[in-house]
Amino acid sequence: MTELKPLLIELGTEELPVNALPNLSRAFFEGVLAGLEKRGIVVDHGEAKSLSTPRRLAVLLTAVAVEQPKQYRELFGPYLNTAFDTEGKPTKALEGFAAKCGVNWRTLERIRDTKGERFVHRVVVPGERTDALLPGILTEAIAGMPIPKPMRWGAHEYLFARPVHWLVMLLGQDVVEAEIMGVKAGRISRGHRFLYDKPVSLSDPQNYIDVLQAAYVLVDPAARRARIVAEIEAVARQVGGVARITEDNVAQVVNLVEWPSAVLCSFERVFLEVPQEALIQTMEVNQKFFPVLDSLGKLTEKFIGIANIESNDVAEVAKGYERVIRPRFSDAKFFFNEDLKQGLKAMGERLRTVTYHAKLGTLADKVARVLVLAEAIAPQIGVDPLLARRVALLSKNDLQSRMVNEFPELQGIAGHHYALISGELPEVAMAIEDAYRPRFSGDEIARSPLGKVLGLAERLDTLACGFAVGMKPTGNKDPFGLRRNALGLARTMIESRFDLDLKVLLDQASDWVAFATTIEQERHAQESVKQSKKEAAVKHSVPQVSDEKSARIEELYDFIVERLRGYYADKGIPTTHFNAVAELKPVSLYDFHRRLDAIGRFAALPEAEALAVANKRIRNILRKAEIKIPASVDATLFDQPAESGLLVALEGVITDTRSALDCKNYVSVLTCLARLRPPIDEFFDKVMVNDENLMLRANRLALLQRLGEYLCCVAAIEHLSN
């Protein structure tokens, strides 16, 4: 039995980049494991730990074999027909092989393969010791790390994210001799930079976490996270509030500290006059602080900072944090007051001076297009078109505010506040902010009907614009954010149960974009031909229908639907089900969703697989047909009971499901289709479709064509076939 020992590798550095630390730690851990496994060294993965702090990367394995297993090798020699001469004496080939193996040829074994019998020498090579292999393993692991900006440090030749100051390598209680990046391995680590700034001697890997904790270092990120969250919640409770704790903020702070300690801070209440989103943005994104809210979710004047020390003078630490935040809050208040002086209307007037795209005009032009689309969508979902017009008219005004210029993440949010202050209806103000939802992956869609209308109109215009000017996404490039806009559009339609004709909306959006590009061309032409804008508008007021436009609408539709593939995959919907519905190209995405739901239920029926196979067979037969197929079935040409039986069953199902299909009750339709399995099976068992009699053949093909069309009335069910 191979002896197992714990292994510790710790690489000590200057403070590593906070955003890169998780990936560096993961890659370091995986690289060490991969190196051990590559060399056949046994590792117990049960208690394996990837550990890190801003100043160190560590791998802790509880059980690693002290040596490789024995290596069994086979060296293949010559075949018998070349190993001996005609007199049966060994040839130079055999003697040379034996000499290479260091044995007498008579001791060699023989094996037989497809070419005949040959000599083989089997040897057992002792495994190398793990401590001898570890330097190479560590070097490989470091070389494979995703270092964002590798640099040389001092007089050293190595490239790394930060200077390396120490290296601990212990296999059991023994130091592994190695020199990596100019540092010799040992058993000396370092404690906290301020609370325990002295060497820490490690005698055994199994004591690593506890010894460092005694030196004021929580080396396990999970332990630091737990302490941070617990302390923040406790401090917030002390002042009767609730801390706003986001995963992104916690993840950042975890990688900034080795010994976290929560500190309660405060700011002047006058800053609460500023929209709270701006203050929260400043605290979380710029300073990594945690705002404290009241029971209603409103921001209070309290916030919590996480210090990397346990201070004897917490009040002084708090003053430092407050001193840092005050200038930023003062700036936010200044921007807010300046915006109030100019007002929302003045901001909107400046949209004419901002180019949206060289071929698409200004932001004011975009607002005009969105306004028309919003007016068209609103009555279809029960929203007042006048309100839709108003919210569209105001939707981009805040882009010209000082607040959004300083805090781009507040677009829409700032507009909401300024609209309320300007006396707009609450639903109009809310819709300005709401329309931006979903802002990120996993975010909720817009909550208000008016916000949904604006969000749909905005995204339709953006998608049509992007495709019209050739800004389609390629690889990881998506300058217009078309993928995100497409998914936001689709999610809003589906999750709001809006049964809207997507192709009609895309057609309308494309018309207005075509009009915009034409006007822009005329604007440029005015410089040379002095043609008036009014003449250009009259000349081009009716967009021309073209094959190119139709193709673009189809391309846009396919692009949007393709974004749904991942959306449904995340919900566990099989790709085969998605493909079955996508082939029919339903014009309504909510209708797409209902068909997909029905297919999921249909697939669970025992008849589903057989009908899917039958439909695939029908398609193959029709595709290979070499004669013209009649438009209708002639029952007088039937000469087999199975033919008439199938037609009667099909007509019965069509009659029974007509109402359900009109009401889009797809589950009921597909359940009825299951009744067709017996007559379909009998038809294929008893009837020769490609009969020599061409009239019979054509009539049977017509029957199959009608059957195939109805089997696919909800989805192309052949995709369900295994």
Swiss-Prot record:
EC numbers: 6.1.1.14
Cellular localization per UniProt: Cytoplasm
GO biological process: arginyl-tRNA aminoacylation; glycyl-tRNA aminoacylation
InterPro entries on file: DALR_anticod-bd (IPR008909), Gly-tRNA-synth_bsu (IPR015944), Gly-tRNA-synth_heterodimer (IPR006194)
Molecular function GO terms recorded: arginine-tRNA ligase activity; ATP binding; glycine-tRNA ligase activity
Catalytic activity line of the entry: tRNA(Gly) + glycine + ATP = glycyl-tRNA(Gly) + AMP + diphosphate
Lineage top rank: taxon: Bacteria
Keywords for this protein: Aminoacyl-tRNA synthetase, ATP-binding, Cytoplasm, Ligase, Nucleotide-binding, Protein biosynthesis
Major subcellular location class: cytoplasm
GO cellular component: cytosol
Family as reported in the entry's similarity comment: Belongs to the class-II aminoacyl-tRNA synthetase family.
NCBIfam families: glyS
Quaternary data: Tetramer of two alpha and two beta subunits.
Protein name: Glycine--tRNA ligase beta subunit
